[in-house]
Amino acid sequence: CHSLRYDRLYSRRNTCLYLLLTWMLTALATVPNFLVGSLKYDPRVFSCTFTQTASSSYTVCVVLIHFLVPLGVVSFCYLRIWTLVIRVKGRVRPNPKVRAADLRNFLTMFVVFVLFAVCWAPLNFIGLAVAINPAKVAPNIPEWLFVTSYF
C-alpha cells in the first residue's frame, strides 16, 4: 500500500536517527528529576527511584506526560482503527489468509497496550493520590501495595 513511503521513512540511516532521537529524549526526560531532587534511594524497592513526595506538581506532570497522555493517544488510535474496521467490514472482500494475520497482529499490539496500562497504572495512580495530599496520603499507602506496584 505505502511501500515506497515505508522504504524512505525506515531506511538504515533514518532508523539509526530514530534510535539516536529516542535515546536523546530519554536522557532529556531524566533531567527534571535532578532539578526537582526527586531521585532518592528507596529501601522498600532497593533502588534509586522517583520520589512522589518531592513535588506534587512535578508528580502530576510526570503521570500526565509519561502515562495518561500516551494512554489517551493510543486509546484514541485503537478506537479509530476499530470504528474503521467495523465501518468497512461489509465492503471488503474476504481473504481468510490476510484477515487472520492482520487480526493476529492487531490483537498482539492491543495486548501489549493493555499490559502497558495494567502494569503502569497502579504506580501512576498511587503517584496521583500522593500528589493530591502528600502529607496525608503517602504514610497511609501500605508498603506491600507500593512495592507490588513498583515491580
UniProtKB/Swiss-Prot annotation:
- KW rRNA processing (keyword) present: no
One GO CC annotation: plasma membrane
Extracellular compartment: which residues?
A: 35-58, 131-143
Give GO MF terms, alphabetically: melatonin receptor activity
Indicate how the chain sits in the lipid bilayer. Answer: Multi-pass membrane protein
- For the keyword Transmembrane helix, the answer is yes
Family of this protein: Belongs to the G-protein coupled receptor 1 family.
Write down what this protein is called: Melatonin receptor type 1C
Q: Which organism is it from?
A: Danio rerio (Zebrafish)
Gene assigned in the entry: mtnr1c
